C-alpha cells in the first residue's frame, strides 16, 4: 500500500469479469488497475476502466452484475452505475456482463404480427397475380382466334374470287345454242362491233338466272373454308402454286448426267480410298513383320587369318586341312617341284684335253656341276 498526500490509499485492484453472449459464457478475463478511493469501487469506475481497455462501446453493450456471498453460497447481484461493488476478497472483484438484446420481446411481438400481415398480403398478392395471369391468358386466347379468323377471311376471299371467275367462265361456256346462233347471225350482219353488243344481253340474262346458284355455292364454299381455317387456326394454309417439288430438278435434262457424274466421282473416291487403305495396310504389315523378326546382334569382325596362297579365310585350328585343300598351295608345290627339277646337278661335258703324263693318251672328261 502506498499513501497519498491527500490521505487516500492507492490500491491495486484485480478485476475478474465474464462475458455472456446469447447464453454462452466466455473464458474469464483479468484486469489489474490502481485505484485511489476512500469509499471503494463503483460500477461507473469499472465501466471507465473497461472503456479504456476494450473500447467506449463495450461497457454499455452489457448489463453487469457482481458475485457476492449470500447465506451459504454465492449469487450474482445486478448493478447500476452508482452501485458499490462488494469484493469477493480483500482487493478482488468478480463481475459478469450479459449482452443486452437490441429489441425486447414486447417489441418483437408487433414485428411478428407485421410479418404475419405481410405474409397474408403476400398470399393475397400471389392470388391476385394468378388471377391477372389467367385474365391475360384468356385475353390472348380471345385475341388469337380473331387473328385467325381475319386470316381465314382473307384466304376465303381469295378462294371465293377464284371460284367466281371459274364459275363465270363455266356459265359462259354453258350458254344456250339459240343465243349463240343469234350472236353469230348478228356478227355476220353487223360486224365485229355489233357482235359484242349483241353478246352482252345474253351474258346478263345468263348471269341473272345463275345468281342464286352462285350465292348458294359462295355460301357453301365460304362456310367450308371458314370451318377448315378455324380448325387449322389459319396457320397451316399454303399456296400450292408456289411449292416446287424437289424431284423436278432431277427429272430435267441434266438430271441423269448429274447422277452419272456423281456416281462416277463416288466410285473414284471409293476406289482411291480402297487403294490407299491397301497400301497403308501393306506398309503396316511390313513394319509388323520387321518388328517381329528376331534382331541379330551385329557380327564382330573376324580375326581369322588369310591364306597367302588362295586369299581365303581359314581357322587356325583347321590350317592343315586348308593346306591340303588349298589350290594355291597345290600350285605352289607344283612350281617348287619344277624349280627343284631345274636346279638339280647336270653333268656337263667339256672339251677333252690331253692330260700330260697319261701314257694311254686317251682323253679325260671333266664333269662339273653347274647350277642355273
Swiss-Prot record:
<keyword id="KW-0131">Cell cycle</keyword>
<protein>
    <recommendedName>
        <fullName>Protein SOSEKI 1</fullName>
    </recommendedName>
</protein>
<keyword id="KW-0472">Membrane</keyword>
<dbReference type="Pfam" id="PF06136">
    <property type="entry name" value="SOK"/>
</dbReference>
<feature type="region of interest" description="Disordered">
    <location>
        <begin position="146"/>
        <end position="211"/>
    </location>
</feature>
<feature type="compositionally biased region" description="Polar residues">
    <location>
        <begin position="330"/>
        <end position="347"/>
    </location>
</feature>
<dbReference type="GO" id="GO:0051301">
    <property type="term" value="P:cell division"/>
</dbReference>
<dbReference type="GO" id="GO:0090708">
    <property type="term" value="P:specification of plant organ axis polarity"/>
</dbReference>
<feature type="compositionally biased region" description="Polar residues">
    <location>
        <begin position="178"/>
        <end position="195"/>
    </location>
</feature>
<dbReference type="InterPro" id="IPR048351">
    <property type="entry name" value="SOK_DIX"/>
</dbReference>
<feature type="region of interest" description="DIX-like oligomerization domain">
    <location>
        <begin position="11"/>
        <end position="102"/>
    </location>
</feature>
<keyword id="KW-0132">Cell division</keyword>
<comment type="function">
    <text>SOSEKI proteins (SOK1-5) locally interpret global polarity cues and can influence cell division orientation to coordinate cell polarization relative to body axes, probably by guiding ANGUSTIFOLIA (AN) polarized localization.</text>
</comment>
<dbReference type="GO" id="GO:2000067">
    <property type="term" value="P:regulation of root morphogenesis"/>
</dbReference>
<dbReference type="InterPro" id="IPR021182">
    <property type="entry name" value="SOK_magnoliopsida"/>
</dbReference>
<comment type="subunit">
    <text>Homodimer. Forms long polymer filaments with other SOKs proteins polymers (e.g. SOK1, SOK2, SOK3 and SOK4) crucial for polar localization and biological activity. Binds to ANGUSTIFOLIA (AN).</text>
</comment>
<dbReference type="GO" id="GO:0016324">
    <property type="term" value="C:apical plasma membrane"/>
</dbReference>
<feature type="compositionally biased region" description="Low complexity">
    <location>
        <begin position="149"/>
        <end position="168"/>
    </location>
</feature>
<feature type="region of interest" description="Disordered">
    <location>
        <begin position="330"/>
        <end position="372"/>
    </location>
</feature>
<comment type="similarity">
    <text>Belongs to the SOSEKI family.</text>
</comment>
<dbReference type="InterPro" id="IPR010369">
    <property type="entry name" value="SOK"/>
</dbReference>
<keyword id="KW-1003">Cell membrane</keyword>
<feature type="short sequence motif" description="Association to cell membranes">
    <location>
        <begin position="233"/>
        <end position="234"/>
    </location>
</feature>
<keyword id="KW-0217">Developmental protein</keyword>
<dbReference type="GO" id="GO:0042803">
    <property type="term" value="F:protein homodimerization activity"/>
</dbReference>
<dbReference type="GO" id="GO:0051302">
    <property type="term" value="P:regulation of cell division"/>
</dbReference>
<feature type="compositionally biased region" description="Low complexity">
    <location>
        <begin position="202"/>
        <end position="211"/>
    </location>
</feature>
<dbReference type="GO" id="GO:1905392">
    <property type="term" value="P:plant organ morphogenesis"/>
</dbReference>
<dbReference type="GO" id="GO:0051258">
    <property type="term" value="P:protein polymerization"/>
</dbReference>
Amino acid at each position: 500500500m502506498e499513501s497519498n498526500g491527500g490521505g487516500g490509499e492507492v490500491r491495486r485492484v484485480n478485476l475478474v469479469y465474464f462475458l455472456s453472449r446469447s447464453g454462452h459464457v466466455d473464458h474469464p478475463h483479468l484486469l489489474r488497475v490502481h485505484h485511489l478511493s476512500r469509499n471503494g469501487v463503483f460500477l461507473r469506475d469499472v465501466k471507465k476502466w473497461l472503456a479504456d481497455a476494450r473500447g467506449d462501446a463495450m461497457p454499455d453493450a452489457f448489463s453487469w452484475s457482481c458475485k457476492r456471498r449470500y447465506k451459504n453460497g454465492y449469487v450474482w447481484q445486478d448493478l447500476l452505475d452508482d452501485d458499490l461493488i462488494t469484493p469477493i476478497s480483500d482487493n478482488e472483484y468478480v463481475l459478469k456482463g450479459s449482452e443486452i438484446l437490441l429489441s425486447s420481446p414486447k417489441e418483437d411481438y408487433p414485428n411478428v404480427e407485421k410479418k404475419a400481415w405481410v405474409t397474408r398480403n403476400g398470399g393475397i398478392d400471389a392470388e391476385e397475380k394468378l388471377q391477372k395471369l389467367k385474365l391475360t391468358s384468356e385475353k390472348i386466347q380471345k385475341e388469337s382466334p380473331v387473328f385467325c379468323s381475319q386470316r381465314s377471311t382473307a384466304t376465303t376471299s381469295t378462294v371465293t374470287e377464284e371460284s367466281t371467275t371459274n364459275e363465270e367462265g363455266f356459265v359462259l361456256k354453258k350458254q344456250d345454242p339459240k343465243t349463240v346462233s343469234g350472236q353469230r347471225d348478228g356478227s355476220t350482219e353487223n360486224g365485229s362491233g355489233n357482235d359484242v353488243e349483241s353478246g352482252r344481253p345474253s351474258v346478263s340474262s345468263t348471269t341473272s338466272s345463275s345468281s342464286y346458284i352462285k350465292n348458294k355455292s359462295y355460301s357453301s364454299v365460304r362456310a367450308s373454308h371458314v370451318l377448315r381455317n378455324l380448325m387449322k387456326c389459319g396457320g397451316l394454309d399454303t399456296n400450292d402454286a408456289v411449292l416446287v417439288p424437289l424431284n423436278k430438278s432431277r427429272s430435267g435434262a441434266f438430271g441423269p448426267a448429274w447422277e452419272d457424274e456423281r456416281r462416277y466421282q463416288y466410285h473414284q473416291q471409293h476406289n482411291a480410298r480402297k487403294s490407299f487403305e491397301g497400301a497403308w495396310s501393306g506398309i503396316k504389315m511390313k513394319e509388323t513383320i520387321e518388328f517381329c523378326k528376331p534382331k541379330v546382334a551385329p557380327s564382330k569382325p573376324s580375326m581369322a587369318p588369310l591364306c597367302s596362297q588362295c586369299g581365303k579365310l581359314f581357322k587356325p585350328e583347321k590350317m592343315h586341312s586348308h593346306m591340303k585343300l588349298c589350290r594355291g598351295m597345290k600350285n605352289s608345290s607344283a612350281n617348287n617341284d619344277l624349280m627343284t627339277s631345274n636346279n638339280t646337278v647336270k653333268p656337263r661335258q667339256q672339251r677333252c684335253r690331253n692330260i700330260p703324263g697319261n701314257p694311254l693318251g686317251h682323253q679325260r672328261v671333266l664333269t662339273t656341276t653347274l647350277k642355273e
